[in-house]
Amino acid sequence: MMISEDISEPSSPDTPFDDSDLLNSSMTDDVSAQLAASGPIGVRAAAAIATGKKRKRPHSFETNPSIRRRQQTRLIRKLKATIDEYATRVGQQAVVLTCTPGKHDGNFKVFGAAPLENIMRNLKGIVLQDLDNALAQRAPQPSNENSDLYELPPLVIDGIPTSVNKMTQAQLRAFIPLMLKYSTGRGKPGWGKESCRPVWWPSDLPWANVRSDVRSEDEKRKVSWTHALVTIVINCYKHHGRDDLLPEFIEDKCKEIEASQNQVASLPTATLLPSHAVVHTINNPDGTVSLIQVDTGATVATLADVTQVQQLTNLQTLQQVRLQPLQIQHALGNQQAEATQAVQTLAEVAAAQGGDGELTEGQTVTTLPEGTQLVLASDGSLQAINDGTAQGIVIPASVYQTVVAGDGQPIQIANVNIAQQSGGGTTMAAIKNAVMQSQPIPSQVATLVVNAASHDQHT
């Protein structure tokens, strides 16, 4: 026995569906408008989208054909499981019917409870014909505004307008020969004949069948074949002034803008740190990480994610430390200004020497053994460290900087201030408030080159 109220009950009782204004209500949507103007298959898709939007479903049409195909497979599998559960739990005859009008086979698929499944499959011809007629009555009329423009094929995949940047390599290889027929007016492209080569064909691509990539290995590494095929299509449409046939959906642009904004927002304090700043990381009790600038001791930023520290400071592994010769001058005045000027001079010397300079007369070379540590201090003096377990030197953080030598390798440079004692010798002054310590230098030797003020001084 059949319940009478179930015969014509709409699928959504609160919002009864009325197809009289099916497509007009969605013309304000850029995606639906382009779909409706592309032909019968696009009209079918636009009508389905309008149905979902009228019922307030929080979904949008997937413009990428590859992703759309994966979504179709996933949802069909879910529908089959749902219809089987419905038939088992409720005990009613129920089927799921999907079709694509306009294609040669209609892509007619039906599955569910028997015998209703077999009945619907036998009605395939009637269903497709009635559906084509219903969509044709509501499809927008084609406009003749572009009658004087050059005729080129629309970029459609399975009847759906598709952006050229989202077409797969196989789709591009199949589409370009069709595009050439419209562009050149010839039945065959004439591959390999320079006389048949279109003027818009990229000069750096060979005039050969696009089904195979005949470029050299170097050219293949520089530009992918898919990107080269996209360039061919864009050049053709721009040459003939048919940019209007290159579909670009507003939703895709919004997604790209949102993705770029999220990428920038992930590093909100990146511009707060100068490129030469030396920072010290402190793990706070609440799980955040604070960045302390060594020069001032002030907190630059506090990050919730410890992985952002590497992105902000751009830390590099210290494989080799080379300190270039620097003429030390003793003068009264602003010590910070002198240190800054000295660092700039040292950077110029390092760049000119290509990173490997020769020692000159009056220079003393000190070689630090394996396990030596370089310690940055907040003042401008130098001191040796030997606590029995490790040896090292202290370098003032105010003059610590990294430059790139001529060979492209990073060079750690420092301005070493030598304090002259009353006894005529030169010693390393005591260091206070050391705020940063680098990692030990494994299997490497750090060389410190210092210019002595006179022949009777020592380091």
Curated annotation (Swiss-Prot):
GO terms for cellular component: nucleus. Coiled coil: none annotated. Transcriptional regulator that interacts with specific sites in the control region of the cyIIIa actin gene. Also binds specifically to similar target sites located in the regulatory region of the SM50 gene. One of its GO terms (biological process) is regulation of transcription by RNA polymerase II. It comes from the Eukaryota. PANTHER family: NUCLEAR RESPIRATORY FACTOR 1. This is DNA-binding protein P3A2. Its main location: nucleus. Pfam families: Nrf1_activ_bdg, Nrf1_DNA-bind. Residues 1-25 are annotated as: Disordered. GO terms for molecular function: DNA-binding transcription factor activity, RNA polymerase II-specific; RNA polymerase II cis-regulatory region sequence-specific DNA binding. It is found in: Nucleus. Belongs to the NRF1/Ewg family. InterPro entries: NRF1/Ewg, Nrf1_NLS/DNA-bd_dimer. Keywords: DNA-binding, Nucleus, Transcription, Transcription regulation.
